C-alpha cells in the first residue's frame, strides 16, 4: 500500500481534532468540529482551510504568455500583473485536463495553481506541449497554501499583517506580504462563495501561519465543508463536473472559454464544433422534492428513460434542502422541469432549479 502524502500542516491536525481521510492520495482532514458547524462558520464568520496539497507549477521565460495562450482556454493576454484568472486546460477533444488558476507575477512569470490529484498529469502535459522559450517547473513541494474564507476574513487577517487588504480586488494578489512574521503571497480568492483570501508561503512556514490565524479564534475547516460550500456556490470540482469526457462548455464554464481569442488553443476547434452543433448535454442544478440525497454518479431519469447523471450532491446546510448538480440531456434543462433521481433502487422526484444555489450578499 502506498503511503499517503502529507501537507506541511499535517503534524498539527491531531492538536485541533482533525478526522482525516484519503483524498486523492493525500491524508487530509474531512472535518474538525463537524461539517455543519464548519460550513456555518465560513458562511457567517470565517474558517481556515489547509490547501497545501494543491499543486503549483511555475512558467517562466520570454514566450510564457504565448505558450499559456496555446495551452489554456481563457485569454491570458487580458491578465494584468498582480491579477489572477480562472482557466481550463483542454485535450484536443475539448475534454478537460484540469481547471486551474493562473497568477501573473510579471510579463514573463506565472504561477499555475492546479488540483492536487492532477499535479503530475498537468505538469507532464505542460512539458509535452511546450512551445517557444519557456521553462516549466513543478514547485508544489516548495509551497504551503492556506485559505481563510468568510465575511470576517479581511478583519481577521488584517490583525496579522500590515498589508492593505482592502486594496486587493477579487482575483487580485500582492507579493512579499508579511503575515505573522512570514513572507507570503496574499490572493483575494477562494472556493466557497464567500469573500476571503488564499495565502501562499514556503512550506516550512505554513504551520506558523496556520496557528497564528487559528489563534485569532478562527475555526479550522475540513474537506467535508469545503465540498458543501463549493457546491452551494456551484464551483466545479474536477473528476465530477469536469473530466476528460466533460468539456467546459457542458459544465457551463463558457466565461473561461474564449473561442474568439486570436490564439489557437488546444481543444479550441473541438469546442467550436461542439458549440456550433449545439450541446447535447448540460450541467444543471436540481433540488429534490421527495426525501433523499443525490450523490455522485446516481442516474437521472424522466419517465423511465435515463437522461443523465448526478455529478455532485448534498444536503445544503445553508438552505436545508437536498441539492445536486446533474449533467443531463439538453432537452430537459428548463427551470422547474421535473425529473427523478435513482437513489438505491428507488426513483426520487426532483426538479431543475436556478443556480448558484447560494450567492452571498455583496
UniProtKB/Swiss-Prot annotation:
Homology family: Belongs to the GcvT family.
Entry keyword Transferase: yes
EC number of the protein: 2.1.2.10
One of the record's GO molecular function terms: transaminase activity
SUPFAM superfamilies: Aminomethyltransferase beta-barrel domain, Folate-binding domain
Binding partners and assembly: The glycine cleavage system is composed of four proteins: P, T, L and H.
InterPro entries reported for this sequence: GCS_T (IPR006223), GCS_T_bac (IPR022903), GCST_C (IPR013977), GCV_T_N (IPR006222), GcvT/YgfZ/DmdA (IPR028896), GcvT/YgfZ_C (IPR029043), TrmE/GcvT_dom1 (IPR027266)
Role of this protein: The glycine cleavage system catalyzes the degradation of glycine.
Keywords: Aminotransferase, Transferase
Translocase found in the keyword field: no
Protein name: Aminomethyltransferase
Gene3D superfamilies registered for this protein in UniProt: Aminomethyltransferase beta-barrel domains, Aminomethyltransferase fragment, Probable tRNA modification gtpase trme, domain 1
Coiled-coil annotated spans: none
Catalytic activity line of the entry: N(6)-[(R)-S(8)-aminomethyldihydrolipoyl]-L-lysyl-[protein] + (6S)-5,6,7,8-tetrahydrofolate = N(6)-[(R)-dihydrolipoyl]-L-lysyl-[protein] + (6R)-5,10-methylene-5,6,7,8-tetrahydrofolate + NH4(+)
Pfam families: GCV_T, GCV_T_C
Top enzyme category: transferase
PANTHER family the UniProt entry points to: AMINOMETHYLTRANSFERASE, AMINOMETHYLTRANSFERASE, MITOCHONDRIAL
Name of the gene: gcvT
Amino acid at each position: 500500500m502506498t503511503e499517503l502524502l502529507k501537507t506541511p500542516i499535517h503534524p498539527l491536525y491531531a492538536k485541533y481534532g482533525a478526522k482525516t481521510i484519503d483524498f486523492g492520495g493525500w491524508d487530509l482532514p474531512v472535518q474538525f468540529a463537524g461539517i455543519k458547524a464548519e460550513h456555518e462558520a465560513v458562511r457567517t464568520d470565517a474558517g481556515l482551510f489547509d490547501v497545501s496539497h494543491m499543486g503549483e507549477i511555475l512558467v517562466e521565460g520570454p514566450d510564457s504568455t504565448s505558450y499559456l495562450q496555446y495551452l489554456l482556454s481563457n485569454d491570458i493576454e487580458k491578465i494584468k500583473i498582480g491579477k489572477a484568472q480562472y482557466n481550463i486546460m483542454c485535450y484536443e477533444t475539448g475534454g478537460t485536463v484540469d481547471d486551474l488558476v493562473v497568477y501573473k507575477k510579471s510579463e514573463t512569470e506565472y504561477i499555475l495553481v492546479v488540483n492536487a490529484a492532477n499535479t503530475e498529469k498537468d505538469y507532464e502535459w505542460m512539458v509535452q506541449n511546450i512551445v517557444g522559450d519557456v521553462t516549466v517547473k513543478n514547485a508544489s513541494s516548495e509551497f504551503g497554501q492556506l485559505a481563510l474564507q468568510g465575511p470576517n476574513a479581511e478583519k481577521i487577517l488584517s490583525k496579522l499583517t500590515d498589508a492593505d487588504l482592502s486594496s486587493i480586488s477579487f482575483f487580485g494578489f500582492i507579493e512579499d506580504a508579511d503575515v505573522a512574521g512570514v513572507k507570503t503571497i496574499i490572493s483575494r480568492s477562494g472556493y466557497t462563495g464567500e469573500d476571503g483570501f488564499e495565502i501562499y508561503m514556503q512550506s516550512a512556514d505554513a504551520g506558523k501561519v496556520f496557528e497564528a490565524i487559528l489563534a485569532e479564534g478562527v475555526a479550522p475547516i475540513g474537506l467535508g465543508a469545503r465540498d458543501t460550500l463549493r457546491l452551494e456556490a456551484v464551483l466545479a470540482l474536477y473528476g465530477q463536473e469536469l473530466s476528460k469526457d466533460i468539456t467546459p462548455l457542458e459544465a457551463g464554464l463558457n466565461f473561461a472559454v474564449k473561442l474568439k481569442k486570436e490564439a489557437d488553443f488546444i481543444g479550441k476547434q473541438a469546442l467550436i464544433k461542439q458549440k456550433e452543433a449545439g450541446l447535447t448535454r448540460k450541467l444543471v442544478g436540481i433540488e429534490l422534492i421527495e426525501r433523499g440525497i443525490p450523490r455522485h454518479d446516481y442516474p437521472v431519469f424522466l419517465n423511465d428513460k435515463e437522461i443523465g447523471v448526478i455529478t455532485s450532491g448534498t444536503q445544503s446546510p445553508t438552505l436545508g434542502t437536498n441539492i445536486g448538480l446533474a449533467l443531463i440531456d439538453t432537452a430537459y434543462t428548463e427551470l422547474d422541469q421535473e425529473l427523478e433521481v435513482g437513489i438505491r433502487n428507488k426513483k426520487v422526484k426532483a426538479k431543475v432549479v436556478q443556480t448558484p444555489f447560494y450567492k452571498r450578499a455583496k
